[in-house]
Every structure is written in structure tokens, then in C-alpha cells.
């Protein structure tokens, strides 16, 4: 009897978490569909803001959302080592939350640890392939590493999901750098 009650409780909890995540995914799918079709930058930025809001909110655990906010504040104030520990802890708690990986990738970028940042970006993109922020960060690292063709590919991937993405404006500049390198 105790085992079956325990099993039912576990089943209920897991269905709740699954439902919250699928609900969040449905909203994201809708926003990304709108983002592909929008034809003015003001509307695009509003949709982008909504997407970021969802990415920054854990689907089932408000404490993780609060920790992500705290880590982000630490990062903004330049306390990269402490922010890194906060994001590490979040990732251990929920390794499937793409935004925790993205924040850690950002900290590594700010610390000029580009290989670590790229590894974290790869994880972000495995969890959320449409993450235009991670793709933009990846492009910026490739620019710093003078891997210009890879930078363009990263931006082009982001533009598939977000055609009016500001990072698209980097492509002509990157192409100029490629020409300069070939001289």
C-alpha cells in the first residue's frame, strides 16, 4: 500500500513538471513562429524580450530562477568567480536548463576563457537550438579567434529563427575582415 501511494505521488510530480515544461515550450514555439514572420524591428524586439523572459524563468523551480538572477547580478558587477559558482550549482541541480548553461558561457566569455564558453554554448544549443543569444555569443568568440567563416555561420543560424536579429548587422563587417585577411 505504501509503495503504491509513493508511486502515485512520484507520477503526479513528474507529470506536473512535464506539463510545465511542455507549456513553456508551446509558448516559445508560438513566439518563434511570430518572430520569423514579423516585419518591423519594434515588434521583433518585443517578441525577443518575451522569449528572454521565458528562458530566464525556470519552468518548475522558482529558487533556480532566483539563483539565476543572483548569478546574473554578480556577473554584471564583475564578480565572475562567484557568478560561475552560482551557475555551476544551478547546472548540477538542473542540467537541462539551457539558460543556466548560457549564463555560464557568458561568464567564461567575460573571463576570456573562450574554449570553456564555446563548450557551454554547444550545450545550450543542444538543449535549445533556437537560442539566438548563444549563437550570437558563439559568433563573437569566433570573431575574436579570427574564425570569421564560422562566425558568419553562427549568425546565419540565428537569423533562421530571428530574421531581424541585430547581430545580422555584423555580417558585412565580418566579410570585410575576411577580405582584409586575404590581402
Task: Please provide the spans of the model-predicted regions.
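TPR-adjacent "capping" and linker segments in tetratricopeptide-repeat scaffold/adaptor proteins
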Residues: 21-23, 52-66
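TPR/TPR-like (Sel1-like) alpha-helical repeat modules
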Residues: 33-39, 143-166
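Terminal, low-structured helical/coil segments at or just beyond the last alpha-helical repeat
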Residues: 57, 152-183
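Register position in tetratricopeptide repeats
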Residues: 57, 76, 110, 144-145, ...
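Alpha-helical adaptor scaffolds
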Residues: 60-127
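TPR alpha-solenoid repeat register
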Residues: 100, 134, 167-168
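Canonical tetratricopeptide repeat
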Residues: 103, 137, 170-171
